[in-house]
Design a protein with these regions (language model features):
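Noncatalytic, solvent-exposed loop/strand surfaces
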Residues: 15-175
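Sec-dependent N-terminal signal peptides
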Residues: 4-14
Length: 175
């Protein structure tokens, strides 16, 4: 019951208190895929300079941007593993410098996924107030502190809710 309540809270009010430049979840604020920022440049200069670059490993998920931070997920394969073992992680980056502010990791094995899908997390993180929510490719749902990356809670959707495992892994962003 408590987990259901927590999941319900995650679903409620996902757009309150955003600044115009935030893109805190899949498809942006209110999931409309509309950016209502004003003052957008209409013509880009011929040569743009990269402001910052941060290497991340494999995955399909898009970034979430909120209150000066960029949240991304990836999968780091264990090169010594023959069974597709590795580590998934959420990174919080400073949006101005790209500095890694924190990283939250968990061990995982993609051996139950089709090999062609064993490339990393698929779900864009969601930011709401002081928590960022991330879904792992194998169905872990994590609630992390936006400022520190400390885990507030996590559930295993497969075990805790008897959910089946898609052959391509879990790909729904937490809404």
């Amino acid at each position: 019951m408590r987990r259901t309540f927590v999941l319900a809270i995650v679903l409620v009010g996902m757009g309150a208190g955003l600044s115009a430049s935030d893109w805190p979840q899949w498809r942006g604020a209110n999931r409309l895929a509309i950016w209502s920022e004003i003052g957008i440049v209409e013509n880009l200069p011929d040569k743009l300079q990269v402001t910052w670059r941060v290497p991340i490993d494999s995955g399909y998920a898009g970034p979430a941007v909120s209150r000066g931070r960029v949240f991304v997920t990836d999968w780091q394969v264990n090169p010594d593993s023959r069974t597709m073992d590795g580590t998934e992680r959420v990174l919080a980056l400073d949006e101005n410098t790209g500095e890694v502010l924190w990283s939250h990791t968990w061990r995982t094995s993609y051996r139950m996924l089709m090999a062609s899908y064993a490339i990393g997390p698929r779900a864009t993180p969601t930011v709401d107030d002081d928590l960022v929510y991330a879904v792992s490719a194998l169905g872990g749902l994590y609630a992390l502190d936006v400022a520190t990356g400390v885990e507030h809670w996590h559930v295993d959707l497969r075990q805790d809710y008897d959910a089946s495992m898609p052959q391509y892994g879990y790909s729904g962003s937490p809404l």
